[in-house]
Amino acid sequence: MENHTTPRTTWTPRIARRLEIVTTGGMDSILRIGAAMSADGYPVRDFTADVRDGVPYSSVTCTVSLTSAEAATFTERLGTLPAVISVEPC
């Protein structure tokens, strides 16, 4: 009988990182951030948006599971999105 499963050759641990992303542009920017994280394949455990009328800044608080290599480029990657002001651990 043949074994049809392929053993995993590499395994990279992921660490849950809680982040706050500050942005301008209201709900549209919040949705773009969520879409970008989804398109890049980041596992997002929770995603909370705080958008208030008349306030120039909005924020996303989220928990993202990242490898150490992904963590090194995550802030840079999100920083390329228009309207992202900062990405900080919380």
What are these regions (language model features)?
Residues M1-S58, T63-C90:
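Long, contiguous binding/interaction regions
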